[in-house]
Amino acid sequence: MEKTKLTGRIVTRDDPDYNEARTNINLSLERYPDIIVFCQNKQDALNALKWARENRVPFRIRGGRHSYENFSLLNNGLVIDLSEMKKITVNQDKKLAYIEAGAELGEVYRTLWQYGLTLPAGTIANVGLTGLTLGGGIGLLTRAAGLTCDSLVQLEMIVADEKEGADLITVSCSNHPDLFWASQGGGGGNFGIVTSMTFKAVPISQVSIFSITWGWDDFEEVYNTWQNWAPYTDDRLTSSIEFWPKEVNRIEALGQFVGPKTELKKLLKPLLKAGSPTSGMVKTTPFIEAVTFFNSPGGNQPQKMKRSGSFIEKPLSERAISTIKHFLEHAPNQNASVWQQALGGAAGRVAPDQTAFYYRDAIIAQEYLTNWTSPGEKRQNVRWIEGLRTSLSKETMGDYVNWPDIEIRNWPRTYYGENVERLRRVKTTYDPENVFRFEQSIPPLRRSLFF
């Protein structure tokens, strides 16, 4: 039988654009693959998987380059990159959007906006929609319209066959329903190569947005007020809040309300009464302008970084709030922060076992962030993140799989909760030989949970 050849745009170590081609969002975890294939279509992806299997070459799958632990890269081996497959097709009457695997959020938002539609997705413009969806997908429409994966109706996926080949299958709630379930929060890269997704989009036009800032002295009052307000207010309002180190002297709450400014102002009264706000803004704007407002330029830039996170099921105690404050008083640099987003609403009306995204009962998703410039700073930054995570563990649970943390020992249960065994059964059905694997990929049942 004739051997498969790689097709698509192929970059190797000798190419002048190799360094750009291999670079992911996290510069503290350098990886040097031998070959990067930028797939132009589904056939390129099929050929890449077949070639890797025939030649016994390890590989990784990459989309938006936003894997915090660089799980989409490897040393030596092959990277199968989908980022140049970006076609978006919209059926306005049925409100369906067919989106290829390489499309980024900014492009998706802009295209759907032309039809008066959108998806409940994230805020950073160059995050890949596919990876976001496979991990669940939170953003500033979460409480109004659910997680990104809740809007998924179908996907195309390349899976490994029993020999050395690859098959393209269509996955939905009626076709391979177990794999469809796993694709709604089970994380990327575990079961196959997603080449496209189809979503049920939601109508959107004007939204109202807000920003409120405070100084450090209001830390406890603002934290406590926000956590007891944001997850329980009107479902049409989704908000986030970020706390920076003491010397930065800044706390900022942001949010988006699918409704008029007059209603939003009423809803914000409890938050505005907290402490002494240093600035405030409330306005109504076209949704696409809100997308630009919430896009974080810093989140788009490759940098040396460490991330982790957790979920909160009930408001944190004064002791836990003091712990967060203490860590921010002793942060490794001024770029460190603790960021939270309110959950509940539409996302919380889905049962924990209805999709692979387990943490439906959480009221808050909490992310721990830091980045630095000198390689010598890595250790203290990682220790700060892990110390914060461990210190809060008695009052938090799990971690969002899209905020992976290589330091977490029991990562399968941390990411997937009670859904982990079902995910392993799905893995065993579709990838019993563990062809699709990386440092924290779901293992099939016949393999150790920690491998």
Swiss-Prot record:
Its EC number is 1.-.-.-. The gene is ygaK. One of its GO terms (molecular function) is FAD binding. Residues 29-204 form the FAD-binding PCMH-type domain. It comes from the Bacteria. The keyword DNA-binding does not apply. PROSITE patterns: FAD_PCMH. Signal peptide: none annotated. The keyword Nucleotidyltransferase does not apply. Its cofactor is FAD. Keywords: FAD, Flavoprotein, Oxidoreductase. This is Uncharacterized FAD-linked oxidoreductase YgaK. It is an enzyme of class 1 (oxidoreductase). InterPro entries: BBE, FAD-bd_PCMH, FAD-bd_PCMH-like_sf, FAD-bd_PCMH_sub1, FAD-bd_PCMH_sub2, FAD-linked_Oxidoreductase, Oxid_FAD_bind_N. Belongs to the oxygen-dependent FAD-linked oxidoreductase family. The modification Pros-8alpha-FAD histidine is found at residue 66.
